[in-house]
């Protein structure tokens, strides 16, 4: 699954690497939601603007995928768009929503549904432009316990969260 699809770069890679797997793609496809911008500003996380990252569409993303029949677009506000997927299990989730509220919602929804050994690739964990990612992880850990998180040395300050095997 991917939360925060934008133009589909990561979706393309996931779809190409795992052609037999269903790929849920969660995005507003209209840029940042005003509710998230309001919370972002109140927490001092970033200077994100409403509509930023809106230069995309479902059709453009699906048109890039090598196996578009395996992709399921869930357009709208997350976590509302996850309704009906409560019984799903996930092996790999790309969490690239940039902002505090959707990242926290993504962790709350996806982490318990990860299979043992499953991973969340968290974009912007160490990114100074979008500090809400780290704040969301800290809030999640306060509520649900410590995560097995490994920071990566990449341009966007990503991290990998691994669900321990039982």
Q: How would you label these PLM feature ranges?
A:
Residues 1-166:
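S-adenosylmethionine/decaboxylated-SAM
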């Amino acid at each position: 699954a991917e939360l925060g699809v934008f133009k589909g770069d990561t979706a393309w890679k996931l779809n190409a690497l795992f052609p037999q797997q269903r790929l849920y793609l969660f995005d507003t496809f209209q840029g940042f939601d005003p509710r998230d911008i309001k919370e972002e500003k109140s927490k001092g996380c970033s200077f994100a603007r409403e509509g930023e990252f809106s230069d995309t569409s479902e059709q453009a993303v699906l048109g890039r995928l090598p196996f578009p029949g395996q992709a399921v677009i869930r357009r709208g506000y997350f976590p509302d768009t996850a309704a009906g997927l409560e019984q799903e299990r996930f092996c790999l989730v790309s969490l690239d929503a940039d902002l505090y509220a959707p990242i926290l919602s993504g962790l709350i929804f996806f982490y318990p549904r990860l299979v043992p050994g499953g991973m969340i690739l968290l974009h912007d964990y160490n990114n100074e432009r979008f500090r809400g990612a780290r704040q969301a992880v800290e809030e999640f850990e306060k509520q649900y316990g410590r995560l097995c998180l490994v920071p990566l040395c990449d341009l966007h300050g990503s991290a990998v969260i691994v669900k321990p095997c039982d």
